Amino acid sequence: MSASREKNKRKEEAAAPAAANEAKKGMSKGLKTTLIAVCAVLIVCIVVFFYMLTSGFFASHTTAATVGTHKLTPAMVNYFYKGAYGNMQNQYGDFMSYVIDSDTPLDEQVYDEESGETWADYFTDQGLINASNAYALYDAAKADGHTLSEDEQASIDSQISSLALYASYYGTNTSGYIAGVYGTGCNEKNFREYLEVVTLADSYATATQNGFIYTDEQIASEYAANPNSYDAVTYRQFLVSDAMFQTDSTDTEDDDAEAEAETLSDEELTALKEELASKMAADTQRDEQAFIDQAYENCLESAKETYAEDSATLKENQLYSSLSTDVADWLFDAGRAEGDTTYIATDSVYYVLYFVSRSTNDYQLPNVRHILFSVSDTTDETAMDEARTKAEDVLTEYEAGDKTAESFGELAKEYTADSNGDEGGLYENIMPGQMVTEFNDWCFDADRKPGDTGIIETSYGVHVMYFDSFGKIYRDALVENALRSADYNAWYDATAGDGSYTTSAFGMKYTTK
């Protein structure tokens, strides 16, 4: 190899590493820039994701369930979930604690042992069924041109305002308070939407129900076809039970009696009940006083004080629907006559019955106004005395005026603590047993006439009463209610649907339980 060629080779070899280094240096710069950009994007995405996660974005923007054509966000599902829980709470009241442990999360409390379903699952299901029904009615209302009344819209605004007041008290804003109560993603906007849906649905359902009107001919035809459904019976009843043939410490005068009660077989107890019931029915036929006397003689010693009253066995104006089938069928038999007696066996007791009378319920129902002075604890005599004084003062004010229904109504608007103040304290077509006993007895007093006034006391406080007028025939009201109920139920089933829904596993993750 010549000297020149060797020199050139060394130059090429020296140049090669330099070129490689230049190439390497250029790739590192580009890669570094790319990596920085990718990392920046990832960081932004992570920040945005966690913001969306913690701010309730997913709870208010994803789909958790679908009812009909409506996609419900997790936040909307939360509202119906809480609504289902509230419905049960209203139904059970103080007994709710016997069903659900308030100190344990609902998704940790089993509702159905066989399926493993929790109470959280139950309320989710009930809430979504309610949502399906509500949105179906909401859509029907929209299609029918039904809108919220001014009062209904004002009620929604009032609920929002109340939450704003609570929020202010707790040092937060309205949406923050709503989220705290109902769950992440819940805010003032979607809560108002929820209220508008359920309020319009309820309003439309109520308007539809009230819209079913019936003619006198329709009412008469229904009564003629089903008189047992609308008549009432008065009768006497005595129950023969196992306890009457077993020794009980409360029914013996022997203080030294320590022996256990004699144990009788089921067959022996049944035979004894049959014997007593059949004898009492046979011995008291056509003799109401004999029935009263034998009830007293046969009852437990611990019940003697109760059965000393003639009214102990009396059942007045009972409807067929309020009785067991066997008892109702005998009492409402077309051939039943006053003084008829019988006995009817059930699994646990024997009914001894004495038929008194049957009524066609063809009397008028009372329309009554009242002014309530509410007392939270009616055992508090100081509070009751204050309420009595106020009631007497208002009655005096009424009597000093023109003493009309209208003037009483104006006083009711001013003074009553009842929710019907805007209607002048008026209750129309009051059904027997609709009101508490004292209120009911005053309304249905046989001597009551329009213009009568009085003061009564109930568990609600002190009432100033005014008998306004007589309303519908009771029988006709019963028939109307039955027809309306049947027609409304048919309409509701057809309009509200079957409560079907679908859920999205991803969206349901963001619901609050």
Set out the residue ranges of the language-model regions.
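Short, solvent-exposed loop/turn elements at domain surfaces
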Residues: T73-P74, Y85-Q91, F95, F245-D251, ...
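Alpha-helix N-cap and coil->helix boundary residues
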Residues: D151, S155, Y214, Q218, ...
